Amino acid sequence: MGKKRKRCPYCGKEFSEYQNPIPTVDIIIEIKNEGIVLIKRKNFPYGWALPGGFVDCGETVEQAAVREAREETSLKVESLRQFRVYSDPKRDPRQHTITVVFIAQAQGTPYPEDDAADLGIFTCKSLPRPIVFDHEIIICDYFNNKLAKGMMI
């Protein structure tokens, strides 16, 4: 399924073309004593989402998470740590992606930038709708993890 046989138009040799998942990052940005930052997307799919995006060639997933946080929220994040990896082929309606999710802290006031039409800081009891991609699953996993550790925000 992930590989197609093709023929070179110049030499006629057969070769394999792979259709691999695209690496992405998402970042759960904690604002102390307030909640987590979600962005309202400017582009399809429309709705609320965690800040995140595609990993650029030449950067690590950690660098991508820091860059995406800054690009979409204007926040400089600290204490970046990996949370989980999500790889459901249907997690993104545009294409098959695999995301590495990070958790980080930030201080200051976030402002929507880049692909964000708006943003907000939310607790588990004040989440906006609709939440796109599989981000509601990710957010629920995050809050359940916090609850299990007795650290609910």
Question: What is the predicted role of each segment?
Answer:
Residues 55-78, 86-142, 153:
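Unchanged
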Residues 1-26:
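Acidic, metal-coordinating catalytic segment for phosphate/diphosphate chemistry
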